[in-house]
Curated annotation (Swiss-Prot):
Belongs to the class-I pyridoxal-phosphate-dependent aminotransferase family. Gene3D superfamilies: Type I PLP-dependent aspartate aminotransferase-like (Major domain). This is Aromatic amino acid aminotransferase C56E4.03. Has aromatic amino acid transaminase activity. It comes from the Eukaryota.
Length: 474
């Protein structure tokens, strides 16, 4: 039998601890002990008769239609969301478009919870999920639930700017953990926490870690299972809550072999799941991980649907926050997504994830091959990522031909970026992702293989190489 999660209520913020359930959300769950239908005159729910959207139909790929050798190759199926239905396994518009609980539509939530069990199977009793409007919103809920103004939070040395901009206005100090090509260093995390001096830092010892473990944004690094175990052990040692932000989790890839092609690996769903690197959630015996999942990278970012998985304490407190803020994810999105997932089933969704994995592996290989071909090796260095959407590369500062101008790293990067845009290629400057600008002494750029057409990669990288050759000794 799985263990009970630890009582971690001492981690709750003042804001979270003071939240009460919305009475209007509570009354919506009222039931008669006489088992008679409740006629509701309580909540201000609009009558579905006045919803102008009467039915939604969507064309979706038939299972394995993305495989050229499949009998379904190129086939599209149609899924429908009716206004009403007597089928208990249908999410009708009368429900999807109505006010609902902060946890999200029950049918879609059940599907995603089962998906989470298949992939991660958290090893403690009572875990659950809450639907969110994506990981950015989920992070805001988690930060407000766990931190107070004046606290510090552990983050990777380079991190997602939107996450940092969620933290700083809440009065949080972001404490950078050193990184190498394989992600952040457990020994750096342990050193920071072991030697924490509240007077020097001006804040209490951190009790929250924010990390993007797989295909990290911006570096593309992926924590090994051994390093994840070390980090989890340190979280237990120092009583840390781990915010596991994993939008790129399913974009795990085989190693780059120096060519643009990629093998469309034939393996079963069971093999696919087994090959995924274990998550922090899967090793969380204490209930100290809040895992944030999103459909943004594997379905569509505009759907604004995600979910977080956690122990009962954090689920209940998160629900109290969601029900008076975001309330729930878009009903239109939930209706269409559930119709699609119901049509595919769990196995069909895993087939889709395998397809997405292969597609991004191919894209990564094409961009890396273009970089291998055009970027000056005397100036540029990079590690091929094994997950995610990004390649992070360093440009050797010592070879900058305008060193006499004493420009800062951000100034140099901004200059190179502006010249690149003039040449018709856009990319991200490394300083945008730096947590502590005081220790920013290297030139980095981040490129993504997610969006541009494959045939555009060579053109873009050749253009950028020209900019580098105009500014560095190549």
């Amino acid at each position: 039998m799985a263990a009970q999660p630890k009582d971690l209520s001492h981690h709750l913020s003042v804001e979270s601890a003071s939240r009460k359930q919305s009475p209007l959300k509570a009354v919506a769950l009222s039931k008669s002990s006489r088992n008679i239908k409740i006629i509701s005159l309580a909540g201000g729910l609009p009558n579905p008769e006045y919803f102008p959207i009467r039915e939604m139909d969507a064309e979706i790929p038939a299972i394995n239609s993305w495989k050229k050798d499949s009998s379904n190759s190129g086939k599209l199926d149609t899924v429908s969301v009716p206004m009403s239905s007597s089928d208990s396994d249908v999410l009708p518009l009368s429900v999807a478009l109505q006010y609902g609980q902060g946890s999200g539509a029950a049918l879609l939530s059940q599907f995603l919870k089962e998906h989470t069990r298949i992939i991660h199977n958290p090893p403690y009793e009572g875990w659950n999920i809450i639907m969110t409007t994506g990981n950015t919103s989920c992070l805001d809920i988690a930060l407000r639930m766990l931190t107070n103004r004046g606290d510090s939070i552990l983050v990777e040395k380079y991190s997602f700017p939107s996450a940092l901009q969620s933290m700083r206005p809440l009065g949080l100090s972001c404490i950078p953990i050193d990184m190498d090509q394989f992600g952040f260093l457990p020994e750096s995390m342990d050193d920071i926490l072991t030697n924490w001096d509240a007077t020097s830092y001006g804040s209490p010892k951190p009790h929250v870690l924010y990390t993007i473990p797989t295909g990290q944004n911006p570096t593309g690094s992926t924590l090994s299972v051994e390093r994840r175990k070390q980090i989890y052990t340190l979280a237990q040692k120092h009583d840390i809550i781990i915010l596991e932000d994993e939008p790129y989790y399913y974009l795990q890839m085989d190693a780059y072999e120096g060519k643009p092609e990629a093998a469309d690996k034939a393996f079963t769903n069971e093999q696919f799941v087994k090959e995924l690197i274990p998550s922090f959630l899967s090793m969380d015996v204490d209930g100290r991980v809040i895992r944030m999942d999103s459909l943004s990278k594997v379905v569509a970012p505009g759907s604004r649907v995600g979910w977080f998985t956690a122990q009962p304490l954090f689920i209940e407190r998160g629900l109290r926050a969601a029900e008076t803020a975001t309330q729930s994810a878009s009903g239109i999105s939930q209706g269409i997504l559930y119709a699609m997932f119901k049509h595919w089933g769990q196995d069909g969704y895993l087939e889709w994830l395998k397809h997405i994995r292969y597609s991004y592996t191919l894209r990564r290989n094409y961009l890396l091959y273009a970089m291998d071909t055009y970027l000056p090796k005397s100036v540029c260095s990079y590690i091929p990522p094994v997950a995610g959407m990004f390649i992070w590369f360093e440009v050797d500062k010592s070879r900058y031909i305008h060193a006499d101008k004493n420009e800062s790293i951000p100034e140099i990067e901004s200059k190179i970026h502006a010249e690149a845009v003039e040449e018709g290629v856009n990319l991200a400057c490394g300083n945008w992702f730096v947590v502590d600008p005081r220790v920013n002494d290297k030139i980095f750029f981040r490129v993504t293989f997610a969006h541009a057409e494959l045939e555009e990669f060579n053109v873009a990288i050749e253009r950028f190489a020209g900019v580098l050759k105009n500014n560095f000794k190549c």
